[in-house]
Amino acid sequence: MGSRYERLQKIGEGSYGVVFRARDVTTGTIVAVKRIRLEKEEEGVPCTAIREISILKELRHENIVRLLDVCHSEKRLTLVFECMEMDLKKYMDHVGGDLDAGTIQEFMRSLLSGVRFCHERNVLHRDLKPPNLLISREKELKLADFGLGRAFGIPVKKFTQEVVTLWYRSPDVLLGSTQYGTPVDIWSVGCIFAEMAIGAPLFTGKNDADQLLRIFQFLGTPNRQVWPSMDTYPNSSNMLSRPEFQQTLAATCEEQFQTNPAYAKLGPQGIDLLRWLLRYEPSERLTAAQALEHPYFSVEF
């Protein structure tokens, strides 16, 4: 880890390395050290790590975890980040999944502020989920784990489809879309918003088809009016011709919004915002900037 950082304890394992809490011996500051093993030296640094480094060096914002230092040796790459108390998933577990209305609103404002900052700089996060949102001791929420993040230019490049943990994946990506932009992050934000209210993930599919079916059960089976581009994706005909997608499912969300007391925490404005984040048609989802202007953020809880 180098003589500058004194290892304290292991706090997690990411997609390509181990994360430790450590002390910067020169300043006494507690930091998070992500150590990335370079399995085959001739291959050098994993491209996912290079991507994360280049993105994070550019992104300086109060709602994005700060990359403080990069140490590179032949066999190891070490990224030093500001240390956060816990991730949103652990935080929700810690409070029994029961976040109060004011905390949900504050976390949503922070989440959308971080996402807006990324999107304005042509960066997609592409893996937004509670374990990748870190909470400080002062209850500030910050975006982390940009391993899948990628700058997007115009024209939109074709991306790999395997992004965003299944439960937070948008219906267009589930149908094989590889040409997408900011709306893929916005769908994930909507899923996280609902999860903070109800204390559990909104859509817990076992595979792509099951995930899509759960979305249809909640929002109702879409038609071409609701989702004009639904037939244009690579897997549309294959997926939507399956027997389980032949029946038209009525939306259960309206009943849940009325009867599930957990949603009452969001209030009518919060439920309206959630509807705009979870739109089938990607171009109809609010942008992060538009979402921050939503009346929900003027409500005092």
From Swiss-Prot:
Q: Identify the InterPro entries for this entry.
A: CDK, Kinase-like_dom_sf, Prot_kinase_dom, Protein_kinase_ATP_BS, Ser/Thr_kinase_AS
Active site (record annotation): D127
Q: Which gene encodes it?
A: CRK1
Check the record and name the Pfam families matching this protein.
Pkinase
Q: Which CDD domains match?
A: STKc_CDK_like (cd07829)
Q: Which family does it belong to?
A: Belongs to the protein kinase superfamily. CMGC Ser/Thr protein kinase family. CDC2/CDKX subfamily.
The answer, when asked if rRNA processing is one of the entry's keywords, is no
Single GO BP term: protein phosphorylation
How might one describe the regulation of this protein's activity?
A: Phosphorylation at Ser-15 or Tyr-16 inactivates the enzyme, while phosphorylation at Thr-160 activates it.
Keyword flag Kinase: yes
Which residues are modified to Phosphotyrosine? Y16
Domain Protein kinase residues, every copy = 5-297
Query: What's the Enzyme Commission number for this chain?
Result: 2.7.11.22
Q: Where does ATP bind?
A: I11, G12, E13, G14, S15, Y16, G17, V18, V19, K34
According to its UniProt entry, this protein's organism is Trypanosoma brucei brucei
- Protein origin, superkingdom: Eukaryota
- Annotated protein name in UniProt: Cell division control protein 2 homolog 1
Q: State the SMART domains in the record.
A: S_TKc
The modified positions for Phosphothreonine read T160
EC class, as a word, reads transferase
- Please give the subunit comment from the record: Forms a stable but non-covalent complex with a regulatory subunit and with a cyclin.
Q: Which UniProt keywords apply?
A: ATP-binding, Kinase, Nucleotide-binding, Phosphoprotein, Serine/threonine-protein kinase, Transferase
